[in-house]
Amino acid sequence: MKVRLKSIAILLVSISVFTGCFKWGSRAYDRFPETIALDKNYFYEGKVIIVGAGASGLAAARILERNNINYEILEATDRYGGRLQKDTLLADFPIDLGAEWIHNQPGILNKLIGLPGDWTSEELLPYSIDSVFSWDGIDYVQTEKEELDAFFNFFPEYKFKSSTWFDYVDDNFARHVKHKIRFNTPVSEIDYSSNKVILKTKDGVEHVADKVLVTVSIGVLKANVIKFNPELSNKKTRAINRVEFLPGFKLAMKFSEKFYPDAIIFDSDIGDHGYY
């Protein structure tokens, strides 16, 4: 298969964007194409530069690697994975510092790497009304339980048990392509006004490519960290601005003894606590 692309493409792909994750997750499996890029063969003789070594960039690089296409990855930081990070020092199990939820059935993990089957070899924890919630002093009536069962069936939720999203991406994508990553190379300008694309980094160094894949996060695009010449089309700009991106953070705390339930989801208006 020959690839005919414009000189620049922006991949708006994320493992876990906060907005609309339920709406997206519940339908993503059904909307997943029968064949994905990893299933196909590509031919391209030019050089491709991928901007960003997050999940999208690593997945794109894996496709190019498998098809022997000349490519390079420019990563702004000193690590790969983007918002996928893990901590192995705080506890005796890895802690996801970035994305951690799988808003879908386990088979989606196979589809992402081009494998058949509805179940994955990854060890996962399913979330259901029986395994997830308990309440202080309140028993579920049958109708409430049925409603919540239906909710979890429509919005399936899983988490990795003894690994993380970072491990999944590292094992299936990064280990094949990390030798092509230039770390600490933040791109500040992309000029695609001629046949060749010129990328300039913050230290003034220029990199030349025939095609460019921009895989930075939506937050970076919204902040206009990268200057494009010519400017992005109104269609692309509107698409970027329409994606809602809310701030958030994670706080992991370690105690000498357990004095609390497994976790607290929220406090309701009447003071009841939900645990998961």
What residue spans do the PLM features occupy?
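N-terminal secretory signal peptides that target proteins for export/translocation
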Residues: 1-3
